């Protein structure tokens, strides 16, 4: 089980990403727009740098919903590989069976 502080930190990052998503997208559009003047693009770049670091979606880490484990997490289930294995063996994931050939 991951420390509760690490799980809460990820939740805080998710809230920041959601809060600043629209502003971030607007500023990135200005920075990438070649028809804007260099001064406007420069100002937008500076303003983009002033946003909180954790507002960047690439800083988020997928974690297991049960254990908080940061590695080996399947996006489809939102669970770590070992928890998927446990739940699948109990037959609680519909359509998921152990491979055999």
UniProtKB/Swiss-Prot annotation:
GO cellular component, one term: cytoplasm
GO molecular function terms noted in the UniProt entry: rRNA binding; structural constituent of ribosome
Transmembrane segments: none
One GO process term, biological-process aspect: translation
Record's keyword terms, sorted: Ribonucleoprotein, Ribosomal protein, RNA-binding, rRNA-binding
Pfam families referenced in this protein's UniProt entry, alphabetically: Ribosomal_S14
Role according to the record: Binds 16S rRNA, required for the assembly of 30S particles and may also be responsible for determining the conformation of the 16S rRNA at the A site.
UniProt xrefs under HAMAP family: Ribosomal_uS14_1
UniProt protein name: Small ribosomal subunit protein uS14
Organism: Burkholderia lata (strain ATCC 17760 / DSM 23089 / LMG 22485 / NCIMB 9086 / R18194 / 383)
Taxonomic placement: Bacteria, Pseudomonadati, Pseudomonadota, Betaproteobacteria, Burkholderiales
């Amino acid at each position: 089980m991951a420390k509760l502080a690490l799980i809460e930190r990820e939740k805080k990052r998710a809230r920041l990403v959601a809060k600043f998503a629209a502003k971030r997208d607007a500023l990135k559009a200005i920075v990438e727009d070649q028809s804007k003047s260099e001064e406007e693009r420069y100002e937008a770049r500076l303003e983009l740098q002033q946003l909180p670091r954790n507002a960047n979606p690439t800083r988020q880490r997928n974690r297991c919903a049960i254990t908080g484990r940061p590695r080996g997490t399947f996006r489809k289930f939102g669970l770590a590989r070992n928890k998927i294995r446990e739940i699948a063996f109990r037959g609680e994931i519909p359509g998921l069976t152990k491979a055999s050939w």
